[in-house]
Amino acid sequence: MTALPAASITSSALDDLDALNAQLEGLRADERVAWALQHGPQDAALSSSFGAQSAVTLHLLSQQRPDIPVILIDTGYLFPETYRFADALTERLKLNLKVYRPLVSRAWMEARHGRLWEQGMVGIDQYNNLRKVEPMRRALDELNVGTWFTGLRRSQSGGRAQTPIVQKRGERYKISPIADWTDRDVWQYLQAHELPYHPLWEQGYVSIGDFHTTRRWEPGMREEDTRFFGLKRECGIHEDI
């Protein structure tokens, strides 16, 4: 195994995240996870959308820390297949699933604001703040998460092209151990460990969120075009938190 960086992630010596990322780029994904679990702030968690390729990070993290909290934000608008996929992976991998939901029900939100996702960028941003960003921020705070693992990858969209392996947001460290993986890397990992894609993958869904703002991929489209009517890729979680 490649030697892991010895310094603690919380030490003043690692205020230079560029140098730290340069070290981590040379490690395998499992080594990055091992390093972050050993040297990062004690309370770690993984967030997962249980989307198209989510089984990779769920397996990667649960193999090294079986009881790591796995945060799922249930917006109330997920595909039925996503709920069933979450159930199946939770059972198979024995996940410590922590489901967080918005403070306001979908019916009450629609009574107050209408169908926000149909109200342009302003409505989409308000929707994302209510249904996704606020619950995620609450989850991270209530679980006192100091080391936050994600499945972000640079190849997923232009906006993620510069995703570092480790970044600092306030006092929290955000770790993306497969940031440099390609779709082929993901496929190879899933095949090697006999893990499934999301059930909708075979129907042409390459990025899966809420049912009303997700569409099938078609020739000529970028992956990011399949979300939010092509207006944007990010829901705000990885921009605002």
UniProtKB/Swiss-Prot annotation:
InterPro entries the UniProt entry points to: PAPS/APS_Rdtase, PAPS_reduct_dom, PAPS_reductase_CysH, Rossmann-like_a/b/a_fold
Compartment(s) of residence: Cytoplasm
Active site (UniProt): 235
Enzymatic class: oxidoreductase
UniProt keyword annotation of Oxidoreductase present: yes
Function: Catalyzes the formation of sulfite from phosphoadenosine 5'-phosphosulfate (PAPS) using thioredoxin as an electron donor.
NCBIfam families found in the cross-reference section: cysH, PAPS_reductase, PRK02090.1
Protein name (database record): Phosphoadenosine 5'-phosphosulfate reductase
Organism of this sequence: Xanthomonas oryzae pv. oryzae (strain PXO99A)
Gene: cysH
